[in-house]
Amino acid sequence: SGDLGAERYAKMCKSCHGADGSNAAMSRALKGLPAEEVKAALIGYKEQTYGGKKKGMMERVVKSLTDEDIEVLATHIGTF
């Protein structure tokens, strides 16, 4: 699933967050965040229960993610 997570990250996240998650994008860097925290944030964005003033971008990005997508992305990002 690591490869799938890397593919999803490259397609959906890298342009704003950087190859290794170190770009702050509109909020903060992803590098160093535990997978569980990333997963909770992605679910929160999808359910529109998480995020600050600029959450609209992330809500648009995650709305099409499946539970599996969220799991593999969180696991991949947790390795940064």
Curated annotation (Swiss-Prot):
It is found in: Periplasm. Its main location: periplasm. Heme c binds at residues 13, 16-17, 58. GO terms for cellular component: periplasmic space. It comes from the Bacteria. InterPro entries: Cyt_c-like_dom, Cyt_c-like_dom_sf. Keywords: Electron transport, Heme, Iron, Metal-binding, Periplasm, Transport. GO terms for molecular function: electron transfer activity; heme binding; metal ion binding. The keyword Electron transport applies. SUPFAM superfamilies: Cytochrome c. Binds 1 heme c group covalently per subunit. The keyword Electron transport applies. It holds the Pfam family Cytochrome_CBB3. Natural electron acceptor for a formate dehydrogenase. This is Cytochrome c-553.
